[in-house]
């Protein structure tokens, strides 16, 4: 069984999974795009929602902007780091209970980029990867990837747009590279490509040599109720009377 652990900036840990726990509930919402289809250029934030108990005589130790490190811990005490999340302003739901919503480091990339762009037109054109590095520097986000999967040297000409965010720069770079952007467990930005991890299985008898295979779980079927076929008419063209068979 796994338990949730939230580590606060001061090192305090809130633990769940047992009677009297400070961390009453925690839900992780994770996605790389908005739907079921592959979407390049996505730059989604994962986020957590936590219900935290606080002593009525004390105060909640979390404030807006705090970095919360989320771990999953098993019965043996082994921990897996899930991610780093930045808290929104906590909401008091009961006398001694608070709801905390926190978004991963991708949310920091919502910082403005237009101001820098307006003041730095002269150095263009720039490689798109350099633009990614500048956007991350502006937002205070570390990079896990050392380059884009492809097209990292694509030359970007001078441009300007109002209300442009660092996240939009990241999204454009991901689109140019045919990939998506996501944060790793250490809160660092990475550019990833979609990989098909489904297994394949041949549908021929054992021992038969056939290169045609299908992806497991990729086939589906449906049952339909149809009227009985009473007559078949064969025609060579729309104007042909044809031959009928009953």
Model-derived segments and spans:
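Solvent-exposed edge beta-strands and adjacent loop segments
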Residues: 1, 5-43
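Acidic, small/polar-enriched beta strand-loop surface segments
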Residues: 1-19, 171, 175, 180-246
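Surface-exposed cap/loop segments at beta↔alpha junctions
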Residues: 2, 54-142
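Extracellular/virion structural assembly segments
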Residues: 29-65
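Short acidic/polar beta-strand-loop edge motifs in secreted extracellular
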Residues: 35-37, 108-133, 146-172
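A generic structural signal for beta-strand entry/edge sites
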Residues: 45-49, 94-99, 186-188
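Surface-exposed or flexible loop/turn and strand-edge residues in extracellular/cell-surface modules
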Residues: 45-47, 65, 82, 216, ...
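Extracellular, surface-exposed passenger/stalk and repeat segments of large secreted bacterial proteins
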Residues: 87, 102-104, 154-159, 200-207, ...
């Amino acid at each position: 069984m796994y338990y949730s652990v939230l580590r606060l900036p001061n090192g305090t840990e809130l633990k769940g999974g047992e009677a009297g726990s400070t961390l009453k509930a925690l839900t992780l919402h994770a996605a790389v795009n908005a739907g079921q289809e592959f979407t390049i250029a996505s730059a989604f934030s994962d986020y957590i929602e936590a219900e935290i108990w606080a002593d009525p005589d004390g105060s909640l130790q979390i404030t807006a902007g705090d970095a919360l490190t989320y771990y999953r811990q098993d019965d043996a005490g082994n921990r897996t780091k899930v991610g780093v999340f930045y808290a929104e302003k906590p909401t008091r739901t009961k006398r001694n209970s608070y709801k905390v919503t926190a978004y991963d480091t991708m949310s920091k990339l919502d910082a403005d980029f237009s101001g820098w762009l307006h003041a730095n037109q002269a150095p263009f054109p720039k490689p798109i990867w350099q633009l990614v590095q500048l956007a991350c520097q502006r937002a205070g986000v570390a990079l896990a990837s050392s380059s884009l999967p492809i097209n990292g040297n694509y030359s970007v000409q001078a441009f300007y747009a109002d209300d442009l965010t660092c996240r939009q720069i990241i999204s454009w770079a991901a689109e140019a590279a045919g990939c998506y952007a996501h944060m790793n467990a250490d809160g660092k930005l990475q550019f990833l490509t979609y990989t098909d991890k489904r297994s394949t299985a041949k549908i021929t008898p054992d021992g038969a040599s056939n290169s045609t295979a299908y992806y497991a779980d990729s086939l589906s079927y449906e049952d339909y109720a149809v009227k009985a076929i009473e007559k078949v008419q064969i025609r060579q063209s729309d104007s042909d009377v044809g031959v009928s068979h009953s």
